[in-house]
Amino acid sequence: MTSINCNFLGLNAIKLAGKKKKFGRKHGGIAVFVHESITKGVSKIPTKGSDLIILKLDRMFFNLMEDTYLFFAYCSPANSSYTQRTDNDPFSEIEENISNLGTNAQILLLGDLNARTGEDNSDLFLPDSYNTDIVATYPRGNRDPVKNQYGGSLTSLCKSVPPRIYNGRKLGDTVGNFTCHKWNGQSAVDYCLASPGTNI
């Protein structure tokens, strides 16, 4: 982990340097900026890879009911040379880290997951005895009709561990707007996932 101090803004960066080599040097990786006024309540959870940062928000410091874990993730595209070369499965890594926190952990996962889920709403697994909450009563909107390999991995992740997809389910984005705009089209590949009952 590399830490960069941005004192002029009162921010500290938690950065993971990329492991991908390009022209003999590293590139990629992710960074999260934390304001100095809250750094005492934020701690970093160790991870194996270079594309996942997990921060723990201390419940006492933030006056929360439970400790909350913020996952910041980047998943290299499934067909990228890096993914092919390393046989990397980012969703297995995310699932393992969530499982290690236990079933009562409050989780918020944000990131560019390069997952296209199309109209697949199977991410919301409800047992027969489930009492409906507000999120579950809304079908998830998604303006991106395409589903790719990572889309299937993401919905499988949501069935095996608590977080559910909030894109297209919350006020402000009930239609599931596009999150990526390029010269050759638009897609929804950036996500917000949260544990059931998380107040976001």
Predicted regions and their residues:
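A shared catalytic/ligand-binding motif for oxyanion handling
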Residues: 1-200
